[in-house]
């Protein structure tokens, strides 16, 4: 591994560790702030924004985009959109496993003893945010495939994360850790699937 790659990975891990630590530290403060600044109109809006992060919506969008790209004969974008779907599925599976393993109660749920069977209740699926992990993984691959288009879509997972905290579904740490999980899934999928596109394009240019 090149020194530059080691440096980037080390920097990324350091930033992630600091972000996770800070998120857990400010969990209670952010939860209390949100609870004191909720209003009915904004709560209704945030519920609708939160639905944008639902897994089926991302999956259908990915399928439609893949179908269009395949129909147009664009191999690059067919691979990109398929990679987005794979990253979406990976983030969903890993996130679900972590939710069941940690069984963290949502901010809106009163603290009580967590029995084994309650691990499978959505009330105890706070950590990490599945909506955020899926959205970040999905659009993260798009960013790695085309940073200009991906950059324009970055506000979507950000708004989803804010909405999940506002409606009391997640803590700040749930959202931050989910974003990191989504980034890792996007990088992993892109490394194996999108790298072939970059190598092919570089050979054509050379």
Predicted segments, located by residue:
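Membrane-embedded catalytic cores of phosphoryl/pyrophosphoryl-handling enzymes
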Residues: 2-10, 113-206
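Juxtamembrane/transmembrane-helix boundary motifs in multi-pass membrane proteins
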Residues: 3-7, 39-42, 71-79, 83, ...
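Alpha-helical transmembrane segments in multi-pass membrane proteins
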Residues: 19, 83-87, 91, 95, ...
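Transmembrane helix-loop junctions in multipass membrane proteins, especially transporters and channels
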Residues: 28, 32, 70-74, 100-108, ...
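N-terminal transmembrane-helix/juxtamembrane module of multi-pass inner/ER membrane proteins
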Residues: 1-62, 99-121
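Membrane-interface loops
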Residues: 32, 74-144, 149
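Alpha-helical membrane-inserting segments
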Residues: 27, 42, 65, 90, ...
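Aromatic-anchored segments of alpha-helical transmembrane domains
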Residues: 17-23, 89-96, 157-169
């Amino acid at each position: 591994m090149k020194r530059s790659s080691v440096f980037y990975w080390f920097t990324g891990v350091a930033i992630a560790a600091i972000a996770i630590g800070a998120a857990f530290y400010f969990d209670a403060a952010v939860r209390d702030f949100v609870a004191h600044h909720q209003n009915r109109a904004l709560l209704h809006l945030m519920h609708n924004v939160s639905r944008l992060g639902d897994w089926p919506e991302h999956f259908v969008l990915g399928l439609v985009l893949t179908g269009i790209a395949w129909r147009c004969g664009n191999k690059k974008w067919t691979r990109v959109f398929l990679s987005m779907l794979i990253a979406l599925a990976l983030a969903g599976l890993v996130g679900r496993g972590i939710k069941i393993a940690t069984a963290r109660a949502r901010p809106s749920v009163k603290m009580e003893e967590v029995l084994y069977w309650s691990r499978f209740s959505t009330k105890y699926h706070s950590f990490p945010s599945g909506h955020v992990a899926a959205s970040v993984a999905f659009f993260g691959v798009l960013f790695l495939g085309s940073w200009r288009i991906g950059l324009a879509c970055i506000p979507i997972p950000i708004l989803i994360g804010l909405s999940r905290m506002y409606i009391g579904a997640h803590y700040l740490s749930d959202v931050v850790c989910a974003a990191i999980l989504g980034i890792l899934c996007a990088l992993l999928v892109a490394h194996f699937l999108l790298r072939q596109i970059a190598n092919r394009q570089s050979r054509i240019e050379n």
